[in-house]
Regions:
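Hydrophobic helical membrane-anchoring modules
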Residues: 1-5, 17, 25, 153, ...
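Hydrophobic targeting segments
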Residues: 4-10, 19, 26, 37-42
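A short, exposed helix-loop element centered on a Lys and neighboring polar residues
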Residues: 13
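Acidic helix N-cap motif at the loop->helix transition within catalytic regions
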Residues: 17-21, 48-57
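Short beta-strand/loop segment that forms part of the nucleotide-sugar
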Residues: 35-46, 67-69
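A conserved acidic beta->alpha catalytic loop
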Residues: 43-52, 98
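Acceptor/aglycone-binding surface of glycosyltransferases and processive sugar-polymer synthases
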Residues: 67-85, 90, 102-183, 210-228
Length: 246
């Protein structure tokens, strides 16, 4: 699959301290790639000065588009919002905060091209990945990976990395059906993709440097329980009421 343009969505929540540096670094990386591109930042709630700082950055980065809304809805909502506005031949998203090194985007796009893939997902378990994150995160990732394999039978090793790329039609077909707004939306994305027949999903190496102290108003265990509940809800919609067949 030859493609000429890329849209990259960046969901941002209370990132006023780092967002300008993050977007400048991301733009520097994308400017080296042989594609036309746009960077779509979705500010998930006007809770600090993130939106204002991005507005000030627009005159300096012509490829930057900024959207936002008053109330915080969750990462899944923000990603969906941006993905459905994107128009690139390939549409992807990457987490703000730059725990993930954007230099690996080029590798993901090469894999998309070489494999004529529907979806490329970053994976901590790819043999060429370089990851730095604590043992307790590894244990939780293993447990959640085992659960999702039992429930959904995904033929991928890691579903949760915040860097994924889709062919335009795949992105619009999948994200128009997404319901989950917060923590388990990655699982719902892959579930919907499989259900729609998009099975050409490949994993790509990443460089991950986990930064302690992610900004959220919820406790760690509240997040874990919310993810489990949302994951069960996806299973219910898939297997019981066949919501995604519509």
């Amino acid at each position: 699959m030859k493609f000429k343009s890329l849209s990259l969505v960046v969901p941002a929540y209370k990132q006023e301290k780092t967002i300008v540096t993050d977007i400048k670094n991301l733009n520097k990386t994308l400017s080296t790639l042989p594609y036309k591109y746009e960077v779509i930042v979705v500010v998930d709630g006007f809770l600090d000065k993130t939106y204002q700082k991005l507005q000030d950055l627009i005159p300096k980065i012509k490829e930057l588009k900024v959207y936002g809304y008053e109330k915080n809805h969750g990462k899944g909502y923000a990603v969906k919002y941006g993905m459905l506005k994107a128009q690139g031949d390939v549409i992807g998203f990457i987490d703000a905060g730059m725990d993930l090194d954007p230099s690996e985007i080029s590798v993901a796009l090469d894999l998309m091209d070489w494999n004529n893939a529907d979806i490329i997902i970053g994976s901590k378990l790819h043999p060429e990945s370089k990851v730095n994150y604590p043992l307790w995160r590894k244990i939780l990732s293993w447990g959640y990976r085992t659960l999702t394999h039992i429930l959904f039978g995904f033929n991928v090793k890691d579903t949760q990395v915040g860097m994924k790329f889709f062919r335009k039609k795949v992105a619009h077909d999948v994200f128009s059906r997404i319901v989950i707004k917060r923590y388990a939306f990655d699982i719902e994305v892959l579930t919907v993709a499989y259900q729609l027949g998009y099975h050409k999903i490949y994993e790509s190496p990443i460089k991950l440097n986990f930064k302690q102290g992610s900004i959220t108003s919820l406790s760690f265990w509240e997040i874990v329980m919310s993810m489990l509940w949302d994951t069960i809800a996806v299973f219910y919609r898939l297997r019981i009421v066949h919501y995604y067949d519509r």
